[in-house]
From Swiss-Prot:
Keywords of the record: Acyltransferase, Flavonoid biosynthesis, Transferase
Protein name: Chalcone synthase 2
Swiss-Prot/TrEMBL catalytic activity: (E)-4-coumaroyl-CoA + 3 malonyl-CoA + 3 H(+) = 2',4,4',6'-tetrahydroxychalcone + 3 CO2 + 4 CoA
Family statement drawn from the similarity comment of this UniProt entry: Belongs to the thiolase-like superfamily. Chalcone/stilbene synthases family.
A Pfam entry, by short name: Chal_sti_synt_N
InterPro entries to which the protein is assigned, alphabetical: Chalcone/stilbene_synt_C, Chalcone/stilbene_synt_N, Chalcone/stilbene_synthase_AS, Polyketide_synthase_type-III, Thiolase-like
Pathway given in the UniProt record: Secondary metabolite biosynthesis; flavonoid biosynthesis
EC number: 2.3.1.74
Entry's Gene Ontology molecular function annotations: naringenin-chalcone synthase activity
Stated role: The primary product of this enzyme is 4,2',4',6'-tetrahydroxychalcone (also termed naringenin-chalcone or chalcone) which can under specific conditions spontaneously isomerize into naringenin.
GO biological process terms on file: flavonoid biosynthetic process
Gene that this sequence comes from: CHS2
CDD domains reported for this sequence: CHS_like
Organism (species): Sorghum bicolor (Sorghum)
Active site: 168
């Protein structure tokens, strides 16, 4: 038998990219139906036929007032809920009705975001080699990744990964996975899509489960897409952020802090009060592990993209780390304008940050800073930490130290 003309090492080297994975485009989408937070308690208690629960409604109103959310977008309309009263009860069998919505609408909303990202990227869809699709909303086979491949007209040979039931940390997870795919497959262009619809979690109020009502006050619908690739061709591709490192960890003593369970009644949501405390208590360790190798100890000298699980989490992280209010501006803006869209949030924040940085004449896509951090927080308690490197917006502009 003739000897091989190349070695495994040579093959491996040829397969791998030279530079770091880079975000090349971002697109976002929401349903048309906009819900204003100030009006939501009246609407929510009316549509769920719970107006007799006056004290509970007052509690819910206070939750909405404290949420720092101005508006959210929701696929579920009053008409649809009126036709499906089981979805408005706290615990009534309704999974079929919920699945009927999300199986169709999750890929459809993902398509809207993906089309915007592909348009900004400016390259043919045939150059997309990988698809990573993430949703906490429903499960199906073949999955939303398959449906989106068909809807967009991607190549049948695109390498797909479907991530179901991850939760709010998964905006970091998809970037971590996309980084590995892009850097280990020379020439790869990874389409990442997070699409979330609250039809699986919407339910009526319960006096014995206030944690469920917290979710009803916070969650909104949205989809975000990014194109990730290494070694960008800067004649036709415009880098936005480099993905420098990515890691995941389970916080100590946090089991049961955030849970979701798929049942006949839909996806139930369970939350312990000390979630903000657990996250803030451990945030410095995550920052040290990520930034010590870079010689960075001043966390006001980096840009911040933090999953806005709720205002209490952001407040306690700011206090623990000693952050200036401006560091969380983009994060709080997305929370205010869209609510908590689970995995899609951090990608919305990246989009807001790069756009606002350009509008404000900042030197880089990261509010003028060179380095940044992206955090995902969710069930586990699981934390995703992604170190980002911005790119200059104007050639020769100084980067804020």
């Amino acid at each position: 038998m003739a000897g091989a003309t190349v070695t495994v090492e040579e093959v491996r080297k040829a397969q791998r990219a030279t530079g770091p994975a880079t975000v090349l485009a971002i697109g976002t989408a929401t349903p048309a139906n906009c819900v204003h937070q100030a009006d939501y308690p009246d609407y929510y208690f009316r549509i769920t036929k719970s107006e007799h629960m006056t004290e509970l409604k007052e509690k819910f109103k206070r939750m909405c007032d404290k949420s720092q959310i101005r508006k959210r977008y929701m696929h579920l309309t009053e008409e649809y809920l009126a036709e499906n009263p089981n979805m408005c009860a706290y615990m009534a069998p309704s999974l079929d009705a919920r699945q009927d919505i999300v199986v169709v609408e999750v890929p459809k909303l993902g398509k809207a975001a993906a089309q915007k990202a592909i348009k900004e990227w400016g390259q043919p869809k045939s150059k997309i080699t990988h698809l990573v699709f993430c949703t906490t909303s429903g499960v199906d086979m073949p999955g939303a990744d398959y449906q989106l491949t068909k809807m967009l007209g991607l190549r049948p040979s695109v390498n797909r990964l479907m991530m179901y039931q991850q939760g709010c940390f998964a905006g970091g997870t998809v970037l971590r996975v996309a980084k590995d795919l892009a850097e280990n497959n020379r020439g790869a262009r990874v389409l990442v899509v997070c699409s979330e619809i609250t039809a699986v979690t919407f339910r009526g109020p319960s006096e014995s489960h206030l944690d469920s009502m917290v979710g009803q006050a916070l969650f909104g619908d949205g989809a975000a897409a990014v194109i990730v690739g290494a070694d960008p061709d800067e004649r036709v591709e415009r880098p936005l952020f480099q993905l420098v490192s990515a890691s995941q960890t389970i916080l100590p003593d946090s089991e049961g802090a955030i849970d979701g369970h798929l049942r006949e009644v839909g996806l139930t949501f369970h939350l312990l009060k000390d979630v903000p405390g657990l996250i803030s208590k451990n945030i410095e360790r995550s920052l040290e592990e990520a930034f010590k190798p870079l010689g960075i100890t001043d966390y006001n000298s980096i840009f911040w993209v933090a999953h806005p699980g709720g205002p209490a989490i952001l407040d306690q992280v700011e206090a623990k780390v000693g952050l200036e209010k401006e560091r969380m501006r983009a994060t709080r803006h997305v929370l205010s304008e869209y609510g908590n869209m689970s995995s899609a949030c951090v990608l919305f924040i990246l989009d807001e940050m790069r756009k606002r940085s350009a509008e404000d004449g900042r030197a880089t896509t990261g509010e003028g800073f060179e380095w940044g951090v992206l955090f995902g927080f969710g069930p586990g308690l699981t934390v995703e930490t992604v170190v980002l490197h911005s790119v200059p917006i104007t050639t020769g502009a100084a980067i804020t130290a």
